[in-house]
């Protein structure tokens, strides 16, 4: 089991904080579900997977390494991150980018306009890309749009979370 916790929130008022908590609850339910695990294990072609098998990818997403540590099933893994909402610069007003993570840090940023326009399920999907794919799993992807980026672990995970969020409630635990 994996749990997600924001260590430091910046520019997040009570209303946005409630939506963030709701999105993280959705994300945890999805990532810890049998449905999510099956989707990860059954996916046919990840790119930028560092040569790992689907089972190793799943273990890295959930446990932080390709092989679960001894006794891992008894203790949930906690993934901490700092989360900040930032204003979108005027020259990026037409960009579809919702947010980003600075590599090798726990810092995740989301544009305010993107945050405000997302439902809790959409926010869970966005956070899944940043938190599960990048931070928890430590996977990367090409910076330019294209089939290789779309098939990378963070983007595929984002799609799985978005798909499963539409099917909530997921009442089965993995």
Residue positions per predicted region:
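Walker B catalytic acidic pair
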Residues: 130
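Predominantly extracellular/secreted Zn2+-dependent metalloproteases
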Residues: 1-124, 134-174
């Amino acid at each position: 089991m994996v749990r997600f916790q924001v260590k430091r929130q910046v520019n997040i008022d009570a209303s946005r904080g409630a939506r963030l908590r709701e999105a993280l609850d959705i994300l945890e339910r999805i990532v810890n579900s049998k449905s999510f695990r099956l989707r990860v294990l059954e996916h046919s072609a990840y790119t930028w997977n560092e040569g790992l098998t689907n089972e190793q990818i799943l273990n890295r997403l959930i446990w932080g390494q390709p092989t679960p540590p001894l006794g891992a099933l008894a203790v949930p893994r906690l993934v901490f991150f700092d989360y900040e909402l930032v204003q979108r610069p005027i020259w990026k007003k037409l960009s579809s980018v919702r947010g980003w993570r600075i590599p090798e840090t726990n810092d995740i940023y989301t544009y305010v306009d993107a945050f405000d326009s997302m439902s809790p399920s959409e926010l869970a999907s966005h956070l899944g890309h940043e938190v599960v794919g990048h931070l928890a799993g430590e996977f990367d992807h090409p910076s330019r749009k294209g089939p290789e980026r779309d098939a990378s672990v963070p983007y595929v995970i984002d799609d799985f979370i978005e798909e499963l969020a539409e099917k909530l409630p997921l009442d089965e635990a993995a």
